Amino acid sequence: MTAFTNRLQQHFYNSFKSEVSLHCSEVLTQGLQEPSLVSSNALLAKQLGIDPGELTSPEMLQIMSGNQIPESSQPIALVYSGHQFGVWAGQLGDGRAITLGELAVGENATLWDIQLKGAGPTPYSRFADGRAVLRSSIREYLCSEAMHGLGIATTRALCLIDSKTPVYREEVESGATVCRVAESHIRFGSFEHFHYRQQPEAIKALA
């Protein structure tokens, strides 16, 4: 077991679930068949205190593909509401993103979310399959790092995983996962959700 894998197994924080449980739902990941590492972000790994070489380990591949849930993880999907195409759409939520937990980083022990996109359906998937395909995952992986390089606040991608899992879109494509990392995945719609439900205490808890 690598040092980073041990951190994931033993030292995940789950503060969002424990402190603002109304804002999320428990969920389990659904793994990918025959996962393989496409790319890993060495610069981000170092920022998180991770040896970049650890991202290539078999244990890490199983976690980042959703095949194994770390012992200390309590996976969740976040609920939010908002507008789509200029129209109020009501409740939305993480339809294909699952937050595994938070890691303490640096001397100040800043908590960073570790989230998998494409690891299966959640209570907010509606009629979708909760999957991501390699084509769009490559785009997110590259664009998020480009935005970061331009100084635009964004989530970042730690690694990109391909697989033999078939995902049905306009044609059959290969399923993939992106490991997203951010200090928070709370968005404006997280507050809107409880504003329109007239639950001010939930808004205060989130703030």
What does each model-identified segment do?
Residues E34-L37, L43-L55, E59, S65-A207:
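Conserved ATP-binding subdomain of kinase catalytic cores across diverse folds
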Residues M1-M64:
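TRNA-binding/sensing appendages of the translation machinery
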